[in-house]
Amino acid sequence: MIYADVIIDISHEKLDRDFQYRVPEELEQSIKPGVVVTVPFGKGNTVRKGYVIGISTEAKYDASRTKEIQGVS
């Protein structure tokens, strides 16, 4: 399993950090730092634009609660 560290495109001081998302198998070849992605964000899973800033093979958080990248923009 591959995970991407993503900065969400929202201006808010509490969101000034990265969030980790699972990378679906079909997108593994496309995901790299600098790529723009669409991700579900927040309790309502609102679709937001984000920027990949890093890739990892280990989850920083509980992998079962990690959301999945929806697509590449």
Q: Residues of each region from the PLM?
A:
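Terminal, basic amphipathic appendages of nucleotide-handling enzymes
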Residues: 1-73
